[in-house]
Amino acid sequence: MMKLYSLVIIATLAAAAFAATSEEISAAVSEIISQHQQDLERYAKIVERGEEPKKYIRCSKQLGEKCDLNCECCGAAAYCEDIVYICKEKISDNSILNAFGQAMTAMGNAVSRYYCDAE
């Protein structure tokens, strides 16, 4: 049983190595980092202008709905896409990169939760 388990793990890692190049992985990581950096910049500009920041409610938007910050989108791997500002989850058409990107987004969302208030 242990040999079968090890074989499955090795096969999965080999498939991941062939499916995703390091450039694709670093591009996905850079995209996720820039999304959270944009949240910070938008929030900082509001505070800098002395305006009362809009009250953002954590997990108040579903996938496909309009959003302003990542923390508004429901789902551990959901983020606010920065072109049309809608909640989405898909990072890449490559399933391995998509899974990796969703994991990175989930970690980033855990860090950036303080931008939104709990309801």
Curated annotation (Swiss-Prot):
Alphabetic keyword roster: Disulfide bond, Ion channel impairing toxin, Knottin, Secreted, Signal, Toxin
A GO CC term assigned to this protein in UniProt: extracellular region
Tissue localization of expression: Expressed by the venom gland.
Subcellular location(s) of the protein: Secreted
Signal peptide region: 1-19
Disulfide bonds: C59-C74, C67-C80, C71-C116, C73-C87
GO molecular function: ion channel regulator activity; toxin activity
UniProt note: domains: The presence of a 'disulfide through disulfide knot' structurally defines this protein as a knottin.
Family the UniProt entry places it in: Belongs to the neurotoxin 25 family. ICK-8 subfamily.
Function: Ion channel inhibitor.
Name of the protein in its database record: Toxin ICK-9
